[in-house]
Design a protein with these regions (language model features):
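Anion-binding alpha/beta catalytic cores of soluble intermediary-metabolism enzymes, centered on
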Residues: 1-266, 271-334
């Protein structure tokens, strides 16, 4: 089964409540209709009901089964305001500021729906910058217990190379942290291993990569990766991993046997942790464009509830796919 087939199956099983807050965007309305039609999630739309239904009629799509929440006419609005003031107390947020934010920023309102137990996840960003989506997620929802770092992965589907590398590789971090510290690299690896199991359906073999394999080069950049491995060992994580591996040593069995013969994952890694955002972003795009891989992401990880960010150039179909991924992320038992 393809990756998308697996994700759709998990989303159908999960049937989670996913917020799509940017209802002024035609693509979001069309995607919501498709999600409802396929049964991939319980859709929650943020905005004026009359305006949303008018849009659906104009686009000739059905929103039957969607829940529409209007911040201007929401019975729990004051509770939301009070909770947001509590969450942002250290920053001195006033009730008036909280009210204004929730009325004017649907992504923040969507995050509060999750925080208050009225939704399970959110997909946003089609008409707002990544910074707005991540700010709402971090400030309102926060990170998972034991994880301080919000990061991302791309799931790379390489069906044509499955005999060499397997059909699925997980790349992280490719879109959030420019120069991660050792502790952040350890967090990224931990979250990526969890995503590999939950979303990609693979047993993670994690390689923390750099330009050196087992002492072949010396540099502070290499030291940072080695230290990340030490932190993971100290944490006694349950997934297989190794640090200080070059890409060929991580992926190619014959090279791994020469460069890192004692490694538990060399030549067989399927979760690749890049030492910087530059490396990760370049890496996934090279594999996508030159190897013809399908790239699914960025999938945000490390949050206390799933929130995923859309590109402002996204398609309707991609909103559907990312909603299915988010629904699967939100499923505790899946």
């Amino acid at each position: 089964m393809s990756f998308l087939g697996q994700v759709r199956k998990k989303a159908l099983q999960a049937n989670r409540r996913i917020v799509l807050p940017e209802t002024s965007d035609e693509r979001v309305i069309r995607a919501a209709s498709q999600i409802l039609k396929e049964g991939l999630a319980q859709v929650i739309l943020v905005g004026n009901q009359e305006a949303i239904m008018h849009s659906a009629k104009a686009y000739e799509v059905s929103l039957s089964g969607a829940k529409i929440v209007d911040p201007y006419n929401f019975e729990r609005f004051n509770d939301y305001v009070n909770k947001l003031v509590e969450l942002r107390a250290k920053k001195g947020m006033t009730p008036e500021e909280a009210k204004k934010l929730l009325l004017n920023n649907p992504t923040f309102f969507g995050a509060m729906l999750i925080k208050m137990g009225d939704a399970d996840g959110m997909v946003s960003g089609s008409s707002s910058p990544t910074a707005n989506v991540l700010r709402a997620a971090i400030q309102v929802i926060g990170t998972q217990p034991g994880v301080k770092t919000v990061s991302s992965v791309f799931i790379m589907e390489l069906s044509q190379f499955k005999d060499l590398f397997g059909s699925i590789l997980v790349f992280g971090d490719c879109s959030v942290i420019p120069v991660p510290t050792s502790e952040q690299l350890a967090d990224i690896a931990t979250s990526a291993a969890e995503t590999a199991v939950k979303i990609a359906g693979i047993n993670p073999r994690v390689a923390l990569m750099t330009f050196s394999t087992k002492g072949s080069a010396k540099h502070e950049c290499v030291d940072r990766v080695i230290e990340a491995g030490r932190i993971l060992r100290e944490r006694k994580v349950k997934f297989r991993f190794d640090d200080e591996l070059q890409a060929d040593a991580a992926l190619v069995k014959s090279v791994g046997e020469i460069k890192a013969p004692l490694s538990d994952v060399s030549g067989n890694a399927n979760v690749l942790i890049f030492p910087s955002l530059s490396a990760g972003n370049i890496g996934y795009k090279l594999v996508q464009r030159l190897a013809g891989a399908n790239a699914y992401g960025p999938i945000i990880q490390g949050l206390n509830a799933p929130v995923n960010d859309l590109s402002r150039g996204c398609s309707v179909e991609y909103i559907v796919v990312l909603t299915a991924i988010t629904s699967a992320q939100a499923c505790v038992d899946c």
